Regions:
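Conserved, mostly hydrophobic/aromatic
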Residues: 98, 109, 153, 204, ...
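Active-site groove signature of glycoside hydrolases
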Residues: 107, 112, 147-161
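Eukaryotic endomembrane system proteins
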Residues: 156-158, 164-173, 210
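Short, well-ordered coil/turn segments that N-cap beta-strands
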Residues: 102-104, 147-151, 198-202, 249-251, ...
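Acidic, His- and aromatic-enriched active-site or binding-groove loops in soluble protein domains
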Residues: 128-135, 173-188
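Aromatic-lined glycan-binding groove of carbohydrate-active enzymes
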Residues: 197-278
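Long, acidic (Asp/Glu-rich), low-complexity accessory segments flanking structured domains
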Residues: 1-101, 114-146, 150, 210-220, ...
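A generic structural motif
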Residues: 153, 180-195, 230-237, 257-258, ...
Length: 335
């Protein structure tokens, strides 16, 4: 076996990718030109990750309640869980590594673990991931070290959770971030300058009615994330264009999900290859070219998410789009 074979090789490759991605991006918000600090965050270009927590999933745990009954039955066979892992994992980097690489929006799906005593909540995508609390602590440690960086946590799917689970999770969120949490405000008021003055760093979006009871939980409809649900990259890009044309009328943040979604037959045809080798690798260059052609602003992109954010220069490409806002300012001041 080569020195980079097996688990150890995979870990080294991931660390190299994370290191390369992190160069210059850990403090990118704090380093933006002064002119952009008064722009609404909804008008800036911000890199995000899809199923942000899925860098680790537990093959030994039961299949999650987000899966169909037939899948749960099949998953009693250990090989099935190994195959599920290949299609459930959409990121290689940990929260810390993603943050250091410039990712500021996190797509989060959570669940209780049926049969487990207590109210612990876990991340989930087919298989259970780490405890949500552990992820929040990892994120908070980064924020303590980078006080001018602002993040978006989008809790958009909940499984096997009643109100008591939600109250438990919401209290965990409050315990983790405390005064860093930004209370709900008009979207256009929320700028970097606003966040810095109030010493806020975290916006929580919570797609469940209990958000109304907590001033620091933003309603899910303030963070729409239209989903193309296609394996065809051309259809995806057309969908992204169409939904961008519609965003200005809503006065919200906006997520462009630059991701391809496997169908059942896609998985059946490419069982052991997994998501990365079947859909992501070959289509990322075209998706990245689409990103490079975008412009942030009221009529343009805001948050763009991707699978396997380290495979191409994704975060840096999205962040660089903000320079176009400066060019726009220059041209308007000269006219």
């Amino acid at each position: 076996m080569s020195p980079l074979g097996g688990k150890e090789g995979g870990r080294r490759r991931r660390q190299r990718a994370a290191g390369a991605m992190a160069d210059g991006n850990a403090d990118w918000m704090g380093s933006l030109p002064a002119a952009l600090r008064s722009y609404p965050l909804s008008n800036l270009a911000i890199p995000g990750s899809h199923d942000s927590f899925s860098y680790w999933v537990d093959e030994k745990s039961p299949v999650g309640p987000d899966q169909a009954t037939a899948i749960k039955r099949l998953a009693r066979i250990s090989l099935v869980k190994k195959i599920m892992k290949k299609w459930s994992v959409t990121q290689n980097l940990t929260f810390k590594e993603q943050l250091e690489g410039g990712i500021r929006y996190f797509d989060l799906r959570v669940s209780s673990k049926p049969g487990e005593i207590g109210q612990e909540i876990y991340f989930i995508h087919g298989l259970f991931g780490i405890k949500v609390w552990d992820g929040l602590m990892e994120i908070n440690t980064f924020l303590e070290q980078h006080p001018k960086e602002v993040i978006f946590l989008d809790f958009n799917h909940f499984y096997a959770m009643d109100d008591s689970h939600h109250f438990f999770l919401i209290n965990r969120i409050r315990s983790a971030f405390g005064s860093k949490l930004c209370c709900v405000e008009c979207v256009e008021y929320v700028t970097l300058q606003y966040m810095w003055e109030k010493k806020h760093q975290v916006l929580i979006f919570y797609h469940y009615p209990l958000y109304r009871e907590f001033s620091f939980l933003w309603p899910g409809n303030k963070m729409p994330a239209p989903w193309a649900n296609t394996t065809n990259v051309h259809k995806l890009l057309q969908f992204l264009e169409t939904t961008l044309e519609e965003r200005s009328r809503y006065g919200t943040f906006h997520v462009s999900q630059a991701i391809l979604t496997p169908r059942v037959k896609t998985i059946a045809r490419h069982l052991v290859r997994g998501l990365k080798n079947t859909l992501v690798h070959r289509n990322l260059p075209m998706i990245l070219n689409w990103v490079k052609a975008q412009k942030p602003g009221v009529m343009g992109v805001n948050i763009i998410t991707s699978d396997f954010v380290e495979l191409v220069d994704f975060a840096a490409t999205v962040i660089a789009l903000n320079d176009l806002l400066l060019e726009e300012d220059d041209s308007s001041s000269k006219s």
